[in-house]
Amino acid sequence: MMMLMTSITISFLLPMIVMLLATTLSKKSINDREKSSPFECGFDPKLNMPFSIQFFLIAVIFLIFDVEIALILPIVIIMKTSNIMVWTLSTMLFIIILLVGLYYEWNQGALKWAN
């Protein structure tokens, strides 16, 4: 039992000591402003540019509809093995949900690029 406790203690302490040594030895002693800033081919860095929320919303909507289209693709393969009535109803329900979501986004103005 004592051997087990010793090996567990060593297995926890040894990596902690190694990580502590690596952290302290790898620190830079001099913080240079030019070396800390991003390199942008001689141009002034544009880190504080405002990001368009409208562009972000369009990207998220595209991502959502892209995933939904990827979910539609296997429906054609399922058609051969399932009941045609169940397949038709489930496909129509899925497409109606897509269209309702598109209408909602359109109605809320999320698809308008400019005011």
From Swiss-Prot:
One of its GO terms (cellular component) is NADH dehydrogenase complex. It is an enzyme of class 7 (translocase). The chain crosses the membrane at residues 1-21, 58-78, 84-104. Its EC number is 7.1.1.2. Its main location: mitochondrion. Keywords: Electron transport, Membrane, Mitochondrion, NAD, Respiratory chain, Translocase, Transmembrane, Transmembrane helix, Transport, Ubiquinone. It is a multi-pass membrane protein. InterPro entries: NADH_UbQ/plastoQ_OxRdtase_su3, NDAH_ubi_oxred_su3_sf. Belongs to the complex I subunit 3 family. This is NADH-ubiquinone oxidoreductase chain 3.
